[in-house]
């Protein structure tokens, strides 16, 4: 999102591609996964992690993250059949509601989560992975915090958050972080999070 929609260099290449997919039930998820594999472009990475696929030619990893009808009341999902692996789905509905269409260099258009939604998902992932994959999420979150102002622009900030410019010691990065926090709060006030 930062690079293709806003021209912000992320300084590192992502290690995988995550696709959030709203599904009615596990049968729909299984059918989607099976269709991707049957299409010949993707292969399963392991039977233990059914959400992980790999693009055959590039070996680029693809994670399919279901949400919606597979979620439990606490907005988590437990992977069948044993339900020992649990994912937190907090932020997935919000990301879908706040998505933007982005055109990639190859001419492909797809809906991508807004930066406030990406930051919300990053915080959720950081919380989930804090004991197992340290140091992976904080640099991404810092990138969003530092560059959000540049991405949304002065007009958005001045129109919706004019008070941020009242400080005598205006700091661009601090204003960017505060602006992102406010826009995340609006996103979390959406009906899906109430």
Regions found by a protein language model. Give the residues of each.
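Compositionally biased terminal segments of proteins
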Residues: 1-194
């Amino acid at each position: 999102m930062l690079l293709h929609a806003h021209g912000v260099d992320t300084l590192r290449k992502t290690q995988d591609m995550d696709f959030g997919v709203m599904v009615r039930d596990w049968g729909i998820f299984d059918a989607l996964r099976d269709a991707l594999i049957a299409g010949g472009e993707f292969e399963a990475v392991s039977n233990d992690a059914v959400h992980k696929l790999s693009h055959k030619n590039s070996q680029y990893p693809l994670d399919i993250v279901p949400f919606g009808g597979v979620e439990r009341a606490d907005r988590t999902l437990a992977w069948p059949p044993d339900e020992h692996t649990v994912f937190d789905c907090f932020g997935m509905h919000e990301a879908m509601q706040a998505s933007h269409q982005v055109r990639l260099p190859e001419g492909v258009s797809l809906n991508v989560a807004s930066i406030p939604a990406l930051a919300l998902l990053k915080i959720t992932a950081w919380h989930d992975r804090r004991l197992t994959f340290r140091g992976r999420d904080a640099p991404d979150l810092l990138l969003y915090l530092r560059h959000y102002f540049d991405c949304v622009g002065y007009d958005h900030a001045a129109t919706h958050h004019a008070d941020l410019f009242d400080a005598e010691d205006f700091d661009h990065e601090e204003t960017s972080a505060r602006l992102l926090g406010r826009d995340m709060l609006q996103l979390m006030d959406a009906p899906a999070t109430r």
